[in-house]
């Protein structure tokens, strides 16, 4: 099997210091290659990019016209937002849409984030001063056979929003890919820097309610840090009120985020309202488990309690509010052996056959 891969809103590269978006791309490609697929990527290639042992890179501006002569079984499109920063033309991103339209074969859209549905790009182009460089018919998606593979278990809200070029949508547990791509780690709970840590972005304030519920207002003897692009001035003063504030850390790369989580006792996995509607469990759930964190779940978010199968883990790790969370963190701080045993039990509970997982992913692409 041979698949061409493009990414909306970002380049594809295998350099050091990648962000979450690029990590998602590389993880998907690792799933493909472990499942026996040969992968070529079409992207903007820079001289500084190092050669990857996962894929061959083609500079999209030079090679987009050759894609149909290379006998691909599918074109895979990874979700993202295309932005023209400062109004500048981004040829590589516009050519992604040309490839979607012109590819003579199966087009698969990978929907990790339910808010990153495939959108028409021409409305963002037609008023730009450089719009005359492009033909509308090459960019407006008219095909109706695009296959969506998504980690959203409830597809109805996606259908309600309308899926551009949709032929069919199918659930696959993409949220489990950190079990393949994150390196397992054992935390020394007697020497952690923080009791509770969360890595994330503001996401337009869509997680403000949950962030305040679980990371604000905790007792003074529970140390809390939020890091990423989160800042206190983003939060509503009225909603925060006089609650004790967490510390705010800096923005980091994906590797740096993992390194920080390895120095924390616990985290809480939360989600947007639309994540709840679509029953989309975050990749962070499995990533934090593999990294060794005690991983609490917002019970309102993962309402089916499908992360863990062990009833005792479900009982302890699903929390309704900051009161329950604080009580359980105190139990962990008081008995670090219990914390270590719990961290190991989490890993064992979520363990899967990785070869089978990747083979199932490739089979899903073939069958959809």
Language-model regions, residue ranges each:
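Nucleotide-sugar donor-binding catalytic core of glycosyltransferases
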Residues: 2-61, 77-98, 111-314, 354-357
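Short amphipathic alpha-helix with an adjacent loop that forms part of the alpha/beta core around
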Residues: 54, 61-70, 332
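Short beta-strand/loop segments at the ligand-binding rim of alpha/beta enzyme cores
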Residues: 104-107
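Hydrophobic, well-ordered secondary-structure elements that form the walls
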Residues: 288, 325, 346
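C-terminal "capping" alpha-helix adjacent to the active site of nucleotide-linked donor transferases
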Residues: 317-338
């Amino acid at each position: 099997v041979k698949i061409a891969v493009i990414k909306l809103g970002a380049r594809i590269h295998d350099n050091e210091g990648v962000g979450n978006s690029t990590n998602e791309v590389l993880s998907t490609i690792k799933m493909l290659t472990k499942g026996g697929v040969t992968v070529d990527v079409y992207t903007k290639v820079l001289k500084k990019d190092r050669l990857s042992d996962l894929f061959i890179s083609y500079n999209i501006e030079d090679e987009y016209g050759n894609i149909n002569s290379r006998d691909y079984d599918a074109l895979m499109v990874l979700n993202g937002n295309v932005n023209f920063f400062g109004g500048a033309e981004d040829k590589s991103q516009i050519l992604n849409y040309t490839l979607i339209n012109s590819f003579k074969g199966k087009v698969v859209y990978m929907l990790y984030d339910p808010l990153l549905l495939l959108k028409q790009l021409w409305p963002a182009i037609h008023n730009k001063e450089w719009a005359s460089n492009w033909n509308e018919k090459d960019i407006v998606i008219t095909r109706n056979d695009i296959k969506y593979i998504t980690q959203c278990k409830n597809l109805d809200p996606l259908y309600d929003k309308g899926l551009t070029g949709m032929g069919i949508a199918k659930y696959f547990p993409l949220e489990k890919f950190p079990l393949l791509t994150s390196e397992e780690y054992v935390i020394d709970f007697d020497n952690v820097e923080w009791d509770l840590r969360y890595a994330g972005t503001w996401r337009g304030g869509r997680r403000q309610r949950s962030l305040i519920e679980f990371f604000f207002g905790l007792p003074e003897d529970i140390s809390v840090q939020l890091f990423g692009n989160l800042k206190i001035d983003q939060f509503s003063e009225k909603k925060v009120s006089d609650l004790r504030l967490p510390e705010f850390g800096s923005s980091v790369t994906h590797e740096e985020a993992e390194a920080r989580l390895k120095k924390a006792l616990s985290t809480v996995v939360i989600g947007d309202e639309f994540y709840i509607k679509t029953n989309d469990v975050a990749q962070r759930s499995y990533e934090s488990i593999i990294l060794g964190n005690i991983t609490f779940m917002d019970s309102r978010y993962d309402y089916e309690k499908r992360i863990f199968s062990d009833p005792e883990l479900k009982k302890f790790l699903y929390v309704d509010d900051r009161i329950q969370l604080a009580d359980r963190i105190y139990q962990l701080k008081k008995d670090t052996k219990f914390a270590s045993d719990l961290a190991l039990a989490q890993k064992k509970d979520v363990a899967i056959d990785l070869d089978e997982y990747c083979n199932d992913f490739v089979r899903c692409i073939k069958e959809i």
